[in-house]
Every structure is written in C-alpha cells, then in structure tokens.
Swiss-Prot record:
This is 3-hydroxyacyl-[acyl-carrier-protein] dehydratase FabZ. GO terms for cellular component: cytoplasm; membrane. The gene is fabZ. Involved in unsaturated fatty acids biosynthesis. Catalyzes the dehydration of short chain beta-hydroxyacyl-ACPs and long chain saturated and unsaturated beta-hydroxyacyl-ACPs. It comes from Pseudomonas fluorescens (strain Pf0-1). It comes from the Bacteria. The lineage of its organism: Bacteria, Pseudomonadati, Pseudomonadota, Gammaproteobacteria, Pseudomonadales. The active site is at residue 49. One of its GO terms (biological process) is fatty acid biosynthetic process. Keywords: Cytoplasm, Lipid A biosynthesis, Lipid biosynthesis, Lipid metabolism, Lyase.
Length: 146
C-alpha cells in the first residue's frame, strides 16, 4: 500500500495533474498494481468539461491509468524519478471507453506489465467504477534516463 506521500516519490506529477490518490495493491513479482483516484467536483477540469453535466475527460482517465502503470514500472526497476529515470506516455492500443466518470466516483485503476523491449514498456490497463468497466487500453511508455 502507498499513500500520497510515497506516490509523490514515484511520480513527478503534481497538482492538478497527479491523478493517483492511493495504491492499495502492488505486486512486483506478479507485475500488477491497483490504485484509486477519487474524483471530486472540485477537480479543475470540471469547470469546462462540461459545467452543466460534469464528466471526467477521457484523456485524463487514460493518464490516470498511465500514472498507475508508471508507479508499477518504477517499483519493478526499484528506481524513482529522483534517480534520473522517467516514463513518457507514447501511445495506446485497444483503447475503449465504456461509461462516463462523474464527480463523486472512485476510479479504480489496474495495470499489469506485458512486456519491455528496448526501454519501451507495455501495460494492460483498466479503469472501473463500482465494479463496472469505464476504460481499458494497452498503455505504451518509453523509459528515459535524464
């Protein structure tokens, strides 16, 4: 389990772009992670997306899954951004949105390591709310040394 203070050690993102609030499961041997993003009406993106019917932007759901996958990658390598390693989101495959994410929802983020070749990492990711799938994708990240 990781609280927000430890998450901040493994992700370089900060408000308003830090999209993982808590890690509840992390298995480096099984190469999987489960994390939460608590979606509040106070999120800055709700001011414009959409004021009368607020919906979390899909690209931010993808980013939240990528951040959870990034934590898994850092933990698997036993490194942190402060050590000079970063992951850049470079693409996705098999991306699907299934239902909107609304204020008050708890977004459950799951990522499983698929492969790493030439510092290109691939993760199978899923986001859900109340046990219902919201989004799924294969997230592709590039590992870079600073």
């Amino acid at each position: 389990m990781m609280d927000i203070n430890e998450i901040r050690e493994y992700l370089p993102h900060r408000y308003p772009f830090l999209l993982v609030d808590r890690v509840v499961e992390l298995d480096t041997e099984g190469k999987r992670i489960r994390a939460y993003k608590n979606v509040s009406i106070n999120e800055p993106f709700f001011n414009g997306h959409f004021p009368a019917h607020p919906i979390m932007p899909g690209v931010l759901i993808i980013e939240a899954m990528a951040q959870a996958a990034g934590i898994l990658g850092f933990k698997m390598l036993d490194v942190k951004p402060a050590d000079g390693t970063l992951y850049y989101f470079v693409g996705s495959d098999k991306l699907r949105f299934r239902q909107p994410v609304l204020p008050g929802d708890q977004l459950i983020l799951e990522a499983k390591f698929i492969s790493c070749k030439r510092q290109i990492w691939k993760f199978e990711c899923q986001a859900s709310v109340d046990g219902k799938p919201v989004c799924s994708a294969e997230i592709i990240c590039a590992e870079r040394k600073l």
